[in-house]
Every structure is written in C-alpha cells, then in structure tokens.
Amino acid sequence: SVEKDKERYEHKFEYCDLLVTGSGPAGLASAYAAAKSGAKVILAEDKHRFGGSLLMDDVSIDNLSGKDWADKIISELREMPNVIVKNRSQVFGYYDHNMLVMFERTGDHLEKKSEFTPRQRLWYIRCKEVILSTGSIERPIVFGNNDTPGVMLSSGAKEYMKVYGVLVGRKPIIFTNNDSAYETAIEFKNNGVDPLILDT
C-alpha cells in the first residue's frame, strides 16, 4: 500500500535473570520455581492462551486438571512483582551474550483500543539465563501430497476439538506409528465420530 501506516509501534529494552519461552508444563514449572526463589523472570508465550499441551492433554497436577493448574500458576506469576508474563509474544532471535528479541502483538486482537495503544512492540531482552521450553512437535509420517487441505497432524485435530470445540471431520482416517494418535482417536470417539486407524 502507498498509504501511510497510522498505527503505533514501540520497542522496549528489558533485563532479567531468566527468560522462559513457552508456557507448557516445563515452562510454567521453570518460571514458577525461579520466580519463587526471587529471580527476575520473563515468561513469553506466542499463543493467546497459556498452558501449551496442558490445554489438550488429560493430565492431573496437584489434584487439578492441566488447564486449571496452568491457570493457577499464571495467576500466581502475574501477582509477583519480579515476573513479567506475556502472551501473544514470540521470541524469534537469540544473539550473543544472551540477547534475545521478542515480538509482542499488543493491538490486533482488540476490538477497540485507545489511540495510545501500540499495534506491536519489539522487545530487546538481555538475560542471565534462558530456558527454551517451546514444546515438542508430533513427528509426521511423510507421504506424497501430505500438505493438501484436510491432511493434518493428529495433535492438530485434537487441539481443534479440545481447545476450540471444532470437529475437523466426520470420517477421519488416522495414520500413525505411535500411541499419541490414539488419544486423538479417543477424542473423536468422545465427540460421536468413529475414526479409522491405520497403524504401521
């Protein structure tokens, strides 16, 4: 576009003892333990919700569901003066001497925002220590045309059902070589759909 961008953008410099990227079980536990010891902590999550795999997996921690435990830990972290908790914030650069760069989306999700709210903020963070707890990714089975619409990782289908309440198909075929796909099959079954499983 040739029109001038009227949005506001900011940059910020920050220092911390520990930067934790990712808010799944490992990231939350790491940030919480460090914060309780008095360290200055920044917790960064690129999605809008905290919890990572805890939002999808049927796990129990301290007699709470994974989601409830994540919510409890985030609530406690936000109350601590030595902790900065950021969602919609992606750490994308890791440079010499623990200098990291984080991209925070501050305004695009807001229906209404003040004229002083920036659209995005770029953080330059110097840290003593860094924990990269960005989670694991399901290992896909590679085959021709596996990038066509309707083909997805079983973990993606499970996330759609558990987190967003979206059923991704009525006659799913689950092609797998490990146990994790069976959790997705069970979730389909819980939603009234009978999946076909091809297990190598």
How should these model regions be labeled?
Residues 1-200:
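Residues forming the flavin
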